């Protein structure tokens, strides 16, 4: 038995691949969808899953909730917890409470609205080699999966991309392509990526690709997409900024590495959240 916690963009993607591999997972979701559609190039399929969280024979629990909800999922964890989230920090919170946990990195682009999700960009799922059985299932279902011995470099590369794109697009309320079309936005984004690289280097993490180049590649490839943070800000919803730019600032302060652009963007998003909370 496999369990998926959170039927958002990432949770629905995993469920889709599992379905295609012949697996019907158990799903724990906050907002219940009796019927959930997953669409690829206009072709929509109804996801198959069991509602609940009562099964005991769970081999893997895929955690796909927002990073700030990490602690709330701990009572639902069984087997190996595979934590697929944005940013740095959510996995660490889960690992502290539930040691049998590993991180995952997802670079697919999925847009979710209500009880429907749409694949908007094919990427990859990076998993630690310790969860090869899960990797085989996802591959059987059509997922592009890479098993890696050390997943930390991939976590930091994704952090660099998210930190460089999400906050800027949220503040501008513009799709990711603004990072390419606006020299001002691009300057900020590349400074953010360089700061993340500096922090990662101080930690001894060597990213698999140059984060500055990766930001430009991703922004171009997803030019029409609106980042999750931009959508959260537009909806006056809580963002994951504490685990994205906030995490860069936190690690930078601990290591004595300056992160002024990340700090400015972090503070601006937090100020925007405060405006929403004040009415």
Curated annotation (Swiss-Prot):
<dbReference type="InterPro" id="IPR003710">
    <property type="entry name" value="ApbA"/>
</dbReference>
<feature type="binding site">
    <location>
        <position position="162"/>
    </location>
    <ligand>
        <name>substrate</name>
    </ligand>
</feature>
<feature type="binding site">
    <location>
        <position position="158"/>
    </location>
    <ligand>
        <name>substrate</name>
    </ligand>
</feature>
<dbReference type="InterPro" id="IPR013752">
    <property type="entry name" value="KPA_reductase"/>
</dbReference>
<comment type="pathway">
    <text>Cofactor biosynthesis; coenzyme A biosynthesis.</text>
</comment>
<keyword id="KW-0963">Cytoplasm</keyword>
<comment type="function">
    <text>Catalyzes the NAD(P)H-dependent reduction of ketopantoate into pantoic acid.</text>
</comment>
<dbReference type="InterPro" id="IPR013328">
    <property type="entry name" value="6PGD_dom2"/>
</dbReference>
<dbReference type="Pfam" id="PF08546">
    <property type="entry name" value="ApbA_C"/>
</dbReference>
<feature type="binding site">
    <location>
        <begin position="225"/>
        <end position="228"/>
    </location>
    <ligand>
        <name>substrate</name>
    </ligand>
</feature>
<feature type="binding site">
    <location>
        <position position="86"/>
    </location>
    <ligand>
        <name>NADP(+)</name>
    </ligand>
</feature>
<comment type="similarity">
    <text>Belongs to the ketopantoate reductase family.</text>
</comment>
<dbReference type="GO" id="GO:0050661">
    <property type="term" value="F:NADP binding"/>
</dbReference>
<keyword id="KW-0173">Coenzyme A biosynthesis</keyword>
<feature type="binding site">
    <location>
        <position position="166"/>
    </location>
    <ligand>
        <name>substrate</name>
    </ligand>
</feature>
<dbReference type="InterPro" id="IPR050838">
    <property type="entry name" value="Ketopantoate_reductase"/>
</dbReference>
<protein>
    <recommendedName>
        <fullName>2-dehydropantoate 2-reductase</fullName>
        <ecNumber>1.1.1.169</ecNumber>
    </recommendedName>
</protein>
<dbReference type="GO" id="GO:0015940">
    <property type="term" value="P:pantothenate biosynthetic process"/>
</dbReference>
<keyword id="KW-0521">NADP</keyword>
<feature type="binding site">
    <location>
        <begin position="6"/>
        <end position="11"/>
    </location>
    <ligand>
        <name>NADP(+)</name>
    </ligand>
</feature>
<feature type="binding site">
    <location>
        <position position="240"/>
    </location>
    <ligand>
        <name>NADP(+)</name>
    </ligand>
</feature>
<dbReference type="GO" id="GO:0005737">
    <property type="term" value="C:cytoplasm"/>
</dbReference>
<dbReference type="GO" id="GO:0015937">
    <property type="term" value="P:coenzyme A biosynthetic process"/>
</dbReference>
<dbReference type="InterPro" id="IPR008927">
    <property type="entry name" value="6-PGluconate_DH-like_C_sf"/>
</dbReference>
<feature type="binding site">
    <location>
        <position position="66"/>
    </location>
    <ligand>
        <name>NADP(+)</name>
    </ligand>
</feature>
<dbReference type="GO" id="GO:0008677">
    <property type="term" value="F:2-dehydropantoate 2-reductase activity"/>
</dbReference>
<dbReference type="Pfam" id="PF02558">
    <property type="entry name" value="ApbA"/>
</dbReference>
<keyword id="KW-0520">NAD</keyword>
<feature type="binding site">
    <location>
        <position position="176"/>
    </location>
    <ligand>
        <name>substrate</name>
    </ligand>
</feature>
<dbReference type="InterPro" id="IPR036291">
    <property type="entry name" value="NAD(P)-bd_dom_sf"/>
</dbReference>
<dbReference type="InterPro" id="IPR013332">
    <property type="entry name" value="KPR_N"/>
</dbReference>
<keyword id="KW-0560">Oxidoreductase</keyword>
<feature type="active site" description="Proton donor">
    <location>
        <position position="158"/>
    </location>
</feature>
């Amino acid at each position: 038995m496999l369990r998926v916690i959170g039927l958002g963009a990432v949770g629905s993607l995993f469920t889709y691949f599992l379905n295609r591999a012949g697996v019907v997972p158990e799903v724990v979701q906050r907002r219940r969808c009796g019927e959930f559609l997953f669409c690829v190039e206009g072709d929509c399929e109804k996801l198959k899953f069991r509602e609940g969280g009562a099964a005991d024979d769970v081999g893997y629990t895929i955690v796909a909730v927002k990073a700030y909800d990490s602690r709330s999922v701990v009572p639902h964890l069984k087997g190996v917890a595979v934590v697929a989230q944005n940013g740095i920090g959510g996995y660490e919170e889960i690992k502290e409470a539930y040691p049998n946990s590993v991180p995952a990195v997802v670079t697919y682009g999925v847009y979710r609205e209500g009880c429907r999700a749409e694949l908007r960009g094919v990427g990859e799922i990076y998993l630690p080699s310790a969860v090869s059985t899960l990797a085989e299932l996802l591959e059987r279902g059509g997922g592009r999966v890479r098993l890696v011995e050390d997943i930390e470099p991939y976590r930091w590369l994704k952090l660099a991309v998210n930190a460089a794109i999400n906050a800027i697009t949220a503040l501008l309320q513009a799709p990711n392509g603004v990072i390419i079309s606006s020299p001002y936005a691009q300057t900020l984004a590349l400074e953010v990526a360089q700061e993340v690289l500096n922090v990662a280097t101080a930690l001894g993490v060597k990213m698999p690709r140059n984060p500055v180049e990766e930001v430009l590649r991703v922004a171009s490839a997803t030019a029409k997409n609106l980042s999750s943070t931009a959508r959260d800000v537009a909806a006056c919803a809580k963002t994951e900024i504490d685990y994205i730019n906030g995490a860069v600032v936190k690690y930078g302060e601990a290591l004595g590495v300056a992160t002024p652009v990340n700090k400015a963007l972090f503070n601006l998003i937090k100020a925007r959240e405060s405006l929403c909370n004040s009415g």
